[in-house]
Amino acid sequence: MKTWSHVALLACLSIKWLTCVMADSIYCDDPDMCSMTKRFLRFGRALDTTDPFIRLRRQFYRIGRGGYQPYQDKRFLRFGRSEQPDVDDYLRDVVLQSEEPLYRKRRSTEAGGQSEEMTHRTARSAPEPAAENREIMKRETGAEDLDEEKRFMRFGRGDEEAEKRFMRFGKSFMRFGRDMSDVDKRFMRFGKRFMRFGREPGTDKRFMRFGREPGADKRFMRFGKSFDGEEENDDDLYYNESDADSNDDVDKRFMRFGKSAEEKRFMRFGKSEDASRDKKEFLRIGKRESRSAEVENNIQIAAKQS
């Protein structure tokens, strides 16, 4: 095989270089697409010249009116006119920037005369000033509406101020604070009767209360012994009438089982009435205050036999 000469090698290299240059000038005429750092296909406006995403021309996938310039800053799938100037905008600018712009004379309101004031042809007349003394319709606001007692979230416009209670701030219901003089301020309040936890002899602490206070009326959800300050006829939540009528143990009220007036406390099982009933004392709550002599003797006999 005959070797190539230096001229042939130089010609091959020149042809290859020329081919690369022509291909680069034909295929990659857009510098945005020819950038090596822009690799991925991206839609929208580029944030920077070094944006690493390849972008198509803005003419693709566009719906709307085309512009005068071949390359416009229009995004994809936009409706309406572009932000770039159109043909009409160019013509308007050329006319307005001419050496002898067209002017027109404004007609005078006086008869037989014409104003000499020159105005631009595209200028608009000055808007008429609005009437300063125009009456403005306002909503009716009486003197009674300015009362401090008529506050937020009130319903109705009745004359009775005391009946407007619900969903009001500063009135009876849904109020927070302490006011011993107002009896109607009860529900959902802190420091009053319902849903109260604490000890205060001077107030009526009734529902959902835990503790011991001789001077207060502690009724519901109460477990324990009675005090001297409580009423004996208070028979709330008794299971039978015999417990309510018995005077031996007044405060044994809730969750009691049995019909005997004797000392049967909580969660006891059995119905026998003989002397061995004291042995059936499982799941009982509380302590006995007094025991009969017969029960004491039975306990002593059982202790000696054991």
From Swiss-Prot:
Pfam families this protein is in? FARP
State the species of origin.
Answer: Lymnaea stagnalis
Quote the protein name from its UniProt record: FMRFamide neuropeptides
Family per similarity comment: Belongs to the FARP (FMRFamide related peptide) family.
Tissue specificity note: Expressed in 280 cells of the CNS including the EGP heart excitatory motoneurons.
InterPro entries, per database record: FMRFamid-related_peptide-like, FMRFamide-related_np
Q: Where is this region: Disordered?
A: 104-133
Keywords linked to the UniProt accession:
Amidation, Cleavage on pair of basic residues, Neuropeptide, Repeat, Secreted, Signal
The protein's role, per its UniProt record: FMRFamide induces contractions in visceral and somatic musculature as well as in the heart. May play a role as cotransmitters or modulators in a number of significant neuronal systems.
Q: Which residues carry this modification: Isoleucine amide?
A: I63, I285
Entry superkingdom:
Eukaryota
Recite the lineage of the species: Eukaryota, Metazoa, Spiralia, Lophotrochozoa, Mollusca
